[in-house]
Every structure is written in C-alpha cells, then in structure tokens.
Design a protein with these regions (language model features):
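Mixed-charge, glycine-accented linear interaction segment located at domain edges/termini
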Residues: 460-495
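A conserved regulatory-domain signal marking ACT and ACT-like small-molecule sensing domains
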Residues: 374-385, 403-416, 420-458, 469
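A glycine-rich helix N-cap at a beta->alpha junction
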Residues: 45-50
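Alpha/beta enzyme core
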Residues: 1-20, 35-37, 41, 54-179, ...
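Catalytic alpha/beta core domains of metabolic enzymes, predominantly
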Residues: 155-158, 165-282
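A mid-to-C-terminal "edge-of-domain" accessory segment
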Residues: 8, 232-401, 441-448
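Short beta-alpha connecting loops at secondary-structure transitions
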Residues: 153, 207-214, 226-236, 295-302, ...
Length: 496
C-alpha cells in the first residue's frame, strides 16, 4: 500500500540510501499516489520508474511515459531493451526503431527537467549476443541526455568475471556519464557480480534490502552496503541502522529474515560450538569479521550440548553469581544439557528454560509457583476449547478454568487466571509466538514434538521449550517455564 511504501521510504532514508525507487506511476496505484505527495526524505532522492515509449509512438503521445514525466519527482528511471534478440522477438520491432525509442524517450524526460537513469535491460546477455548493438543502445540513451547508464543482468545468470570485464569496457567507452549495475540473483551471485562491477568502475549500485525481488531476488543491499562502505566505495550510510531498518522492512513486507543472512540475520553473530563460543568469550572478535554493533546487530552465545564451561558460566552468572566456583554443579548441568538435547530439547533459542533447569539441578530453584496439573476439553466442532489448570504457591493451591481459541490459548488463559491473584505483574506478560516441530516423524502418531514459545512483557522477549509425545503437555511445560522466568527475582538483571 502507499502507507507501507511511505514507511519503507522513510526507513531507507534514515539508513542513508542515496536513491529510493518507489514504483511506477501509471501502473502502480500506490506509486501514483506517492508521486503526488511530499515524501518523508531528508537525504535520499525519490525516483519514479517507468518504461520508454511504445513502438510507433512519439514520447509525448505515450500516456504512461507522459504520466511519468508529469509527476513532480525530479529523477526518473527509464528501462529500455539492449538485447537485439529481445528487440526483435519481444518488442516485435526493428533495431533502429528501438534506438529511436530510447533516445527520444530519454530526451523527452530531460527536456522536462528530469534527471534520467537509463536501465539497459538484459544488457549482459545482449552484449554476449551482439556487443555492437548493446553498446548502441547505451549511446542512444547518452544522446538523449541520460546521466546514468545501468547495466542490467536481468536474467541473473552472469558470472562476476564477465560482469567485471564488460563493465570495464563500458566505463572506458562512456567516460562522460556514470555507469551503474543492476543484478538479479538467479545464480546466487548477484552480490559478487555487483562488487565485480564496482571494482571495474561502476559508481551507481541498484539493489533491494534483503534481496527482495522477483524469482530469486535482486542484489541484497543488506549484504552489499557493509561491503561497499568498508571498502571505501560508499559514504553517507549509517550502518548501525542496517539491522533495525532491515527488520522494519521485513515486518512491513511480512517476510521472515533467515537467521543465516549475513550482517542482519539473528544467527549472523551467533556462536554455538564450544571452541567458537569459548574464543568469543576470551576475545570478542576472534570468530567475527565485524563488530555486530557496527551493523546494528547483537552477539549471541547459543547453548547446546557442545557448550563449554566458560559459556555455561556466562549464561548462568546473572542468576547464580557463584556458579564459576561450583565445578560439580557445572558438570551436572553440562550432563543434563546433553541428555535433554538427545531427548529432543533445544536450548539455543530457549535460554529461559535452561535457567529454570539449571536452578533445579543446583537445588536453587528460581520458580515461584508449582504447576500441579491441567486438562483440556473440546466438546463441539467449534475451535473453542476449555482448559483447567491447578498451581500451588507456598501452601496455597488454586485452580481456574478458561475458554480459548484452541487448546494452547485456553491453557494460557487458565494459567494466567490462576496466577493473577498471587502475581499481578503477570498481566503484562503475553505469548507472541508458538511453534511446533515433530522431532522423530518416522514414529508417526507416537512421535515426540518440541514446542517453542516466545513471550514478552512489552520490554523484553524470552523463549521457552517443552518436549513430549503429547503436544498439550509440551505446550503446558513451555508455558510454565515462561511464567517461571518472568517471575524470577533476577529477571531484569538478566536482560541488563
């Protein structure tokens, strides 16, 4: 929507991106609306996108091109064909007509006081097919007044070495304008090809945050920007905002950033194996090529059965300050961690459950209540369920029932009802994510499941885990751990 686009434009502007292409007025209603607004930018130049005029038409007779030129945006991107085969087989016109289309369309825009970026579609494939004609299309754009010639790997199959060689030739051929690069990621090399073009002299880079785009996506700016800034090719980018802005865009576009994404993924600076985590604890940069904070991310030390002593101490010290002196306790915790991971538990993302487990092993229970039992019923075809739970706080036992949309929702409501009289602060706590994974699917209906629950109090987020052959039991255990953690005395200290 236009509102979503405004939010993305504002986020990219905060990051310091130099140009923000917001869409095609005349084709996209949201872009049409934006073209009439004052955009929320202080550093970025808004760019409207469109195509050259249709064959057989003069530019001022093409409704879409005229609408593009009439919008108040001072900079336009015009895309035109640079592949002779595409001109004949897709545009269904002759090569000279395509050159006329390019030159006159660009000239029409520049005569109307627009700065034109010319995107040469299918340029690298076109250059390999007919290099002389591909270069002629660029020359036509320059005659029309284009300030930037963007070489497009539209099919996403070009190799970095070829991109570098061809880009260098074009930079030498057209010294009077800037040369740009626009790569798709169909062969997984869009970032590498973009860097190759920059090394060859390209000074205008096109891409998308998180690589969002058709098919396999475009060159990923969340990966490219740190590389370009560190190499000294780009200035004005506030890299400390990279991860927050990437996550803002992901939220707006309703996509999930893969944990393994460089720089901005949740796992980009996560350390699990014993030697790696131990090295990070002793020397912060020993297993990281950049400081996580420099790109707005954070370091995470993940718990697993490979965890070494130093990692266990680092994770447990906020709750058990003398843990470093308790060698026997550390051994028991490490042994329990291995046994429970073998049973299907995972504490990499569920550190809150690990704290609860460690307290019980050390005979220093951090829990404030004891879950006694639960039941869940569903007596109709409707999704609504009824759950009953019982807890004990000191010498007092309390039971409560609640209805919910599904068993987990009902269980959560019943547990909260039980605890509110004892712990009013629980009212601020809410479940925000619930995931289930079958651990051993070959066991079919007897397979164990792992439930991972994410909870927040509005300030902090924590995760807990439960494992059982009964999904309701696994959910109940994960919910119990979540509330145990929220009520622990050192909760705030743990989050710093």
């Amino acid at each position: 929507s236009s509102v979503d686009k405004l939010d993305v434009i504002a986020a990219l502007d905060r990051l310091g991106v130099h140009y923000t292409e917001y869409g095609a007025p005349g084709f996209d209603p949201a872009a049409e609306k934006l073209s009439r607004l004052t955009l929320p930018v202080t550093r970025s130049v808004p760019v409207a996108f469109g195509m050259t005029c249709k064959k057989g038409l003069m530019p001022d007779r093409d409704e879409n091109l005229r609408a593009l030129v009439e919008c108040p945006t001072p900079t336009l991107t015009l895309v035109g064909k640079s592949h002779a085969l595409q001109v004949r087989d897709v545009l269904k016109t002759d090569l000279d007509e395509n050159l006329r289309i390019i030159e006159q369309s660009v000239a029409y825009a520049t005569k109307n006081d627009k700065t034109v970026i010319f995107d040469a579609e299918h340029f690298f494939d076109g250059y390999r097919y007919d290099a002389e004609y591909a270069v002629k299309t660029l020359a036509a754009a320059v005659r029309g007044g284009a300030k930037v010639l963007t070489l497009c790997d539209t099919n996403g199959g070009a190799l970095p070495d070829d991109v570098k060689e061809i880009t260098a030739r074009i930079v030498e051929r057209f010294p009077e304008v800037r040369i740009g690069i626009h790569c798709h990621n169909d062969n997984g090399l869009a970032v590498a090809s973009t860097l190759a073009a920059v090394k060859a002299g390209a000074t205008h880079v096109q891409g998308t945050l998180l690589g969002i785009g058709e098919r396999c996506g475009n060159a990923n700016l969340s990966t490219l920007l740190p590389l370009l800034v560190r190499a000294g090719y780009v200035s004005g980018i506030d890299l400390k905002l990279l991860t927050p802005v990437a996550r803002t865009v992901a939220e707006i576009t309703n996509i999930t950033i893969p944990d393994f994404y460089p720089y901005v993924g949740a796992g980009a600076f996560s350390h699990k194996a014993g030697l790696h985590a131990d090295g990070i604890l002793k020397a912060g940069g020993s297993f990281e090529h950049v400081d996580p904070a420099s790109v707005g991310n954070i370091r995470q030390l993940l718990l697993s059965k490979e965890a070494g002593k130093h990692l266990l101490i680092a994770k447990l010290k906020p709750f058990f300050p003398d843990i470093a002196e308790n060698a026997e306790g550390l051994k028991r915790i490490a042994r329990a961690l291995k046994e429970r991971e073998d049973a299907g538990y995972t504490y990499e993302a569920a550190e809150a459950s690990f704290v609860i487990l460690a307290g019980k092993i050390l005979d220093r229970d951090v829990t404030r209540f004891e879950p006694i039992g639960y039941s869940v019923t569903n007596t109709s075809d409707e999704p609504e369920c009824t759950a009953s739970t019982t807890i004990r706080v000191g010498d007092v036992t309390r039971s409560a029932s609640a209805k919910g949309l599904g068993p987990v929702h009902a269980l959560d409501k019943a547990m909260r009802e039980c605890m509110l009289n004892f712990f009013p602060s629980i009212d601020k706590v809410s479940l925000i994510d619930y995931k289930v994974r079958v651990i051993n699917p070959r066991s079919a209906t007897g397979a164990a499941v792992r439930v991972l629950i994410t909870t927040t109090d509005g300030r902090h987020i924590w995760k807990t885990v439960g494992v059982s052959e009964d999904i309701i039991r696994a959910s109940f255990d994960a919910l119990s751990d979540s509330y145990h953690f929220a009520l622990s005395d050192d909760f705030d200290f743990y989050f710093g």
